[in-house]
């Protein structure tokens, strides 16, 4: 669900940086390299604009808000609504990142693994292991593969399953990450299968298009590719490709 009603856990009269904790929330908190959802929280006497959400070590979701009107009190009942367009923009970038990793492995080799990533509504960065600069020709091949998969309109499925079952399917995990006995797996028709807790499109066609605008070294043996979110989701992102070792 994207709308839930609950009671908040703190009083606040400030206008900026208001922190709100709900018993339940439809908002995705920043984690796993994915930016948090945006949206609004409303009550009988207040309107709050949600600008960030973080999950504490104890499992509380803390919403950082701007109080646009009114005042909030302990015991108020609020309705939380996620900005669907903002979430979809992030989902496009996140699914595109999965396609990118699979394409990089196809072009550069199976030694390629994710070393870090970041996705918000505007951009995606993807850090990956590789022993040398990626050539312009290789990047063109990678980009074409990703766009081919987008235009093939491949279904994206999300399932929770025992970790051993996920491993048998060949699902890729983030190196160094600790997982429980049950994991969430994002699969793109068997072409890309990864452990992932983020938000995704339901079909690759929803991404619209893909263009790598830069590739560079960020550390020894670690490369970074960068891709902006297109202003028009039905068209590939514009920009240029820049390369440096």
Question: How does the language model describe each region?
Answer:
Residues 1-245:
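A glycine- and charged-residue-rich anion-binding loop/surface
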């Amino acid at each position: 669900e994207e709308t839930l009603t609950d009671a908040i856990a703190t009083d606040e009269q400030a206008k900026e940086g208001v922190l709100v904790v709900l018993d339940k929330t439809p908002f995705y908190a920043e984690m796993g390299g994915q930016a948090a959802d945006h949206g609004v929280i409303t009550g009988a006497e207040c309107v709050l604009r949600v600008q960030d959400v973080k999950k504490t070590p104890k499992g509380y979701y803390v919403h950082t808000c701007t109080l646009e009107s009114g005042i909030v009190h302990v015991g108020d009942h609020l309705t939380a609504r996620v900005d669907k367009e903002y979430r979809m923009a992030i989902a496009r970038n996140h699914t595109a990142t999965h396609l990118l990793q699979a394409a990089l492995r196809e072009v550069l080799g199976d030694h390629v693994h994710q070393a870090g990533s970041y996705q918000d509504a505007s951009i995606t960065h993807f850090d990956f292991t590789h022993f040398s600069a990626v050539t312009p020709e290789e990047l063109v091949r990678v980009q074409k593969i990703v766009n081919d998969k987008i235009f093939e309109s491949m279904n994206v499925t999300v399932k929770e399953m025992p970790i051993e079952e996920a491993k048998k399917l060949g699902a890729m995990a983030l190196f160094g990450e600790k997982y429980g006995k049950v994991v969430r797996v994002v699969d793109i028709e068997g072409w890309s299968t990864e452990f992932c807790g983020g938000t995704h499109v339901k079909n690759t066609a929803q991404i619209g298009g893909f263009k790598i605008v830069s590739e560079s070294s960020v550390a020894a043996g670690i490369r970074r590719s960068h891709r902006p979110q297109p202003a028009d989701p039905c068209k590939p992102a514009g920009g240029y490709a820049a390369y440096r070792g």
